[in-house]
Amino acid sequence: MSIRAPPRLLELARQRLLRDQALAISTMEELPRELFPTLFMEAFSRRRCETLKTMVQAWPFTRLPLGSLMKSPHLESLKSVLEGVDVLLTQEVRPRQSKLQVLDLRNVDENFCDIFSGATASFPEALSQKQTADNCPGTGRQQPFMVFIDLCLKNRTLDECLTHLLEWGKQRKGLLHVCCKELQVFGMPIHSIIEVLNMVELDCIQEVEVCCPWELSTLVKFAPYLGQMRNLRKLVLFNIRASACIPPDNKGQFIARFTSQFLKLDYFQNLSMHSVSFLEGHLDQLLRCLQASLEMVVMTDCLLSESDLKHLSWCPSIRQLKELDLRGVTLTHFSPEPLTGLLEQAVATLQTLDLEDCGIMDSQLSAILPVLSRCSQLSTFSFCGNLISMAALENLLRHTVGLSKLSLELYPAPLESYDTQGALCWGRFAELGAELMNTLRDLRQPKIIVFCTVPCPRCGIRASYDLEPSHCLC
């Protein structure tokens, strides 16, 4: 029978302080710093508001990662923390052990106490020192007190905690700086989004993700705020379309008002668009406004014309491109020259290439192989879902011999795997898959390689062949 070890003295002290809020407040300046993380977490979960307010004033670390405790936000607890910060901001002389410089409200997966684990809590101290030493991108200088938040707008109205925080920060401008680096929009009406943006330092925002279906006219209302995000690095757009009711002249004006904002974005590097249709025939307008070299271009399931692809291949901003993703962009009837030119521009830097489900045929593949074989940094190549014969696939594999950094390869099942009606012949697919694997192993030793069929019309899953065949779900 095992005997439970007696509680450590620190644990006994913590339990006593949680039971007696008055004692906790009166002894705060004398508490060992090792007690602060667990005591604060318990006080926050039990909503001991006066204890929270006092603990913030005496916090012995430079960073308070409150975001990890805000999974289920409580307004009164948040108010208590902010009231503690208010006291610090107005004090000429801080309490002896008080070191707080950063209130971090970002939604992270860290466990609050794990952040401070270790005998000396040296890890969070080092982390917080880095965060306070770095200049905020929106200010160009170090601030006396920083509040970090990420904005995720997914409800029709702002929740009360975020509303209170933004109003609180706005009223204390000059005493502290509220820094938001990431903005995500999932479903909030545009007038509410604009209300939020008017309370945020837009210079700080580095990443924007819009994950809700917008009309082009709505995007245009958002665009002027985008142009004020001078340090924006990444923009992700989903499901933006132009209504058929918009007259062509108005559509052109709307597109110009959106694309002209990129003239103000000197640090923009990552363009990601998914199911976006309004730029068909107008991509050149956006490309002409780019001010910096792009690292990533993602345009999946987008409507693009051949001239759009040509303009992309001519764009000087793609010469240092690391990722190109054109999944679901139909290239079947395009000349291979724009894609060849695009790869040529990025041949020295390209690391990820995704041409899945582009409808590429043998002749187009043959044209891009010479430049593809020179993409020496390529580590991920996805090409499944294209209409490629066995002979063309074997030729493709031979052209990958010099690509020593390839670690993930996804290829289509050969056309010969299907019958005349387009149905998969399972035995034939397995036979050809084994043959292709043997061909590749004679050339080099692959790391991860998979041959995939088109999606099953019934279950939507691709059958695959890597070391052995794998059926769909039917």
Curated annotation (Swiss-Prot):
LRR repeats: 97-122, 177-201, 202-228, 229-264, 265-290, 291-322, 323-341, 347-374, 375-399
InterPro entries: LRR_dom_sf, PRAME, PRAME_domain
Tagged with keyword Repeat: yes
Disulfide bonds: none
GO MF, any single term: ubiquitin-like ligase-substrate adaptor activity
Protein name as catalogued: PRAME family member 7
Gene responsible for this protein: PRAMEF7
Protein's organism: Homo sapiens (Human)
Gene3D superfamilies linked to this entry: Ribonuclease Inhibitor (3.80.10.10)
